[in-house]
Amino acid sequence: MLRRKPTRLELKLDDIEEFENIRKDLETRKKQKEDVEVVGGSDGEGAIGLSSDPKSREQMINDRIGYKPQPKPNNRSSQFGSLEF
């Protein structure tokens, strides 16, 4: 394997400005998210979510990930299709 000398990277003024803009955007988003959490936390939702029964906890998780469970049918025709016994 051939070795080569490290390539020098030049830091330009445009790069610094872009970095500062992105950092400011991230900070404002973080502050907005914290403000929403503080307002949501004062409603008491956090305390209810922690102390509630497992069914509602499971339901909260399913809602968060977008999972909508379908009830399983219990009759034989749905399990075996159109087979006749």
Swiss-Prot record:
Disordered: region residues: 30-85
The entry's keywords: Cell cycle, Cell division, Coiled coil, Mitosis, Nucleus, Phosphoprotein, Ubl conjugation pathway
Subunit structure: V-shaped homodimer. Interacts with CDC16. The mammalian APC/C is composed at least of 14 distinct subunits ANAPC1, ANAPC2, CDC27/APC3, ANAPC4, ANAPC5, CDC16/APC6, ANAPC7, CDC23/APC8, ANAPC10, ANAPC11, CDC26/APC12, ANAPC13, ANAPC15 and ANAPC16 that assemble into a complex of at least 19 chains with a combined molecular mass of around 1.2 MDa; APC/C interacts with FZR1 and FBXO5. Interacts with FBXO43.
InterPro entries (alphabetical): APC_suCDC26
Stated family: Belongs to the CDC26 family.
Localization annotation: Nucleus
Residues modified to Phosphoserine: S42, S82
One Pfam family matching this protein: ANAPC_CDC26
Pathway entry: Protein modification; protein ubiquitination
GO biological process, one term: anaphase-promoting complex-dependent catabolic process
UniProt-recorded name of the protein: Anaphase-promoting complex subunit CDC26
Gene behind the chain: CDC26
Residue runs in coiled coils: 7-38
A cellular component annotation (GO) from this entry: cytosol
Superkingdom, taxonomy of origin: Eukaryota
Compositional bias (Polar residues): 73-85
Function: Component of the anaphase promoting complex/cyclosome (APC/C), a cell cycle-regulated E3 ubiquitin ligase that controls progression through mitosis and the G1 phase of the cell cycle. The APC/C complex acts by mediating ubiquitination and subsequent degradation of target proteins: it mainly mediates the formation of 'Lys-11'-linked polyubiquitin chains and, to a lower extent, the formation of 'Lys-48'- and 'Lys-63'-linked polyubiquitin chains. The APC/C complex catalyzes assembly of branched 'Lys-11'-/'Lys-48'-linked branched ubiquitin chains on target proteins.
